[in-house]
Amino acid sequence: MKLTILGATGATGTCLTSQALAAGHEVTAVVRDPARLAVPDHPRLRTVTADVMDPASIAPAVEGADAVINAVGPRGTGPTTVVQDSARSIITAMDKTGARRFLQISGSIVADQGESPYMRYLVKPVARRTFLRHVCADMRRAEDEIRASDLDWTIFRPPALTGKAATGKAANGKAANGKAGACRTAVDRNLPHGFTVSRADLAACVLATLADPAAVRHHIAIAS
């Protein structure tokens, strides 16, 4: 498949780009600074320098893509609109170019369904009012805009991301099957006791979902 990955210089974007190339996909990595791309040159890798917040800037990178993956995320916990603004820009560019498949990395903090009572009624409400309030609000606004679009979207809601190595099992099953090897997945609900997942396993889950029609217009939770 022809994939366009935005946020390709981040930790999650690097995993996505590397794994996509290893799986045989053609990848267009959209970056602000090509020097920050931590993926070696590859015959199926095209690097495009563009501003993800400018639909006209990213439109050439999005045009002709079989799927567009947004791994842009906030760098800290302060006030931010980076997820919402990037999602809005991508939606506009996709509408203009006719691209249809959109995969967005969000977070489990935005939703409660499927959580244990302890997480649902104590931990998450506190986190949303304090240190994660800006990040959560930004992700929620982004999700609202994506759901309001007519794209074939899938939103991924991982918990805290780690730098651990891939289990090698997350891509063995489709995301909508309820389990992905050593990682658990769920559709339109969070996972109880799902506290962390590696970026490598998240990337494998995203790539396994690219052509899965059961995942279109659904939210996918993944956790270790």
Regions found by a protein language model. Give the residues of each.
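Glycine/proline-rich active-site loop of Rossmann-fold NAD(P)-dependent oxidoreductases
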Residues: 165-168, 178-183, 209-218
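N-terminal Rossmann-fold cofactor-binding loop
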Residues: 30-35, 51-52
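Substrate-positioning beta->alpha
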Residues: 82, 87, 138, 156, ...
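Conserved Rossmann-fold cofactor-binding substructure of NAD(P)-dependent oxidoreductases
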Residues: 46-65
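Alpha-helical substrate-binding/gating segment
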Residues: 198-224
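NAD(P)-cofactor binding segment of oxidoreductase domains
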Residues: 75-102, 141
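Conserved beta-loop-beta element that borders a ligand/cofactor-binding pocket
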Residues: 143-164
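N-terminal Rossmann NAD(P)H-binding glycine-rich loop of SDR-like oxidoreductase domains
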Residues: 3-23
